[in-house]
């Protein structure tokens, strides 16, 4: 069985350590558990792609190169190319509605205002995929726009705390792969 893990984020070094790219960072961390596997640029599928074989089947990781708000274009291209069922897709996305460090696994969920999730749902014509929502919290100050916040760099405290988030993400990812998760 083939599974697809979609990391939501923006391509480019300037975005690497931003809250909106926590999906990319999480995918990189998950992939480290499979030694010797790296992302390769795949222009025809609008993504960087890595494939791993696990005891549960093939897992394809993608980091779309379309920017967050257009993630659906890449997801649909990869889904169709590899003939992956929608319910075998897991999307790793930042979540401003969860406190920093909280990780939540859900299926057939709404987007919570996330434009990348909205793009994926529109492109697939369904929300029957799984979401691993990675809490990044909200701005502490009212004068900070939400868009500036998610495109902002992690604080030193968040950079330290992100490791715990990745540990929780690995546990939920493993459950999802094995089919033992609960929505």
From Swiss-Prot:
One GO BP annotation of this record: protein quality control for misfolded or incompletely synthesized proteins
PROSITE patterns, sorted: PEPT_TRNA_HYDROL_1
Catalytic site: 20 (proton acceptor)
Keywords: Cytoplasm, Hydrolase, RNA-binding, tRNA-binding
GO MF, any single term: peptidyl-tRNA hydrolase activity
Main location per the UniProt record: cytoplasm
Pfam family, one: Pept_tRNA_hydro
Family: Belongs to the PTH family.
Protein name per UniProt: Peptidyl-tRNA hydrolase
